[in-house]
Amino acid sequence: IEPEMVNPKSELFEKHPDWAIMLPNRDTYYYRNQLVLDLSNPKVQDYVYSVVENIMKENPEVAFFKWDCNSPITNIYSPYLKNKQGQLYIDHVRGIYNVLKRVKENYPDVPMMLCSGGGARCDYEALKYFTEFWCSDNTDPVERIYIQWGFSQFFPAKAMDAHVTSWNKATSVKFRTDVASMCKLGFDIGLKELTADELAYSQTAVANWKRLQNAIMDGDQYRLVSPYEGNHMALNYVSKDTNKA
């Protein structure tokens, strides 16, 4: 879902053009043909929350949300704040957190991944409302080694989603899976792209990751070899009870 955005050719924008962050009397700049909704406005906060609420009412079996946000704030002006434009960035973020707090309170058992043009919102305040975040849209496994190594200096493995994708097909599925297994393992790849052997390996790898899940998610991390010091990298995870590594 991407409830913070609005398309100019939409019923929402036609009814509430003043709900968008948009500078008056200037040419409007559209990023990805979108505008950002003004979350400093309590009515907009109610609307954004209602997006989640309506989805859950219509689809109570929903088991996972990816909360996306792919546009920076452009056309900087809040119709709601009027002569308090200096508060826009602060009040906008507070408004987002107000929405997320309501979502978390009402749907505490639904896992939610935070994505914002990749990893633009990876911070501990946002993590209060999400179970995990998307470190980067770059899923090349070689480059992900460095990305995940860096993120792991500040965040635990359980907070970072890492997926096997079709990026860099020159690398094996095993290598891509090994890299993604450093964090919360997932697969964003068409099964038809995999050979029978690759599919069988992937199923085994998922089962093995689940076997070690407690050690990876909640154990202690040991940095054995830095990717910045040679042509390979190694991490070790040990469970709190030291029974798994």
Predicted regions and their residues:
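Short, solvent-exposed beta-strand-terminating loops
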Residues: 6-9
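Short, Gly/Pro- and small/polar-rich lid/capping loops
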Residues: 104, 222-226, 236
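Active-site neighborhood of glycoside hydrolase catalytic domains
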Residues: 11-174, 178-200, 206
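Conserved structural scaffold segments of CAZyme catalytic domains across common CAZy folds
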Residues: 201, 216, 242-243
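Glycine-rich, Lys/Arg-enriched anion-binding loops that position phosphate/diphosphate groups
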Residues: 205-231
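Phosphate/diphosphate-binding loops
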Residues: 1-3, 44
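Carbohydrate-binding surface patches
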Residues: 228-245
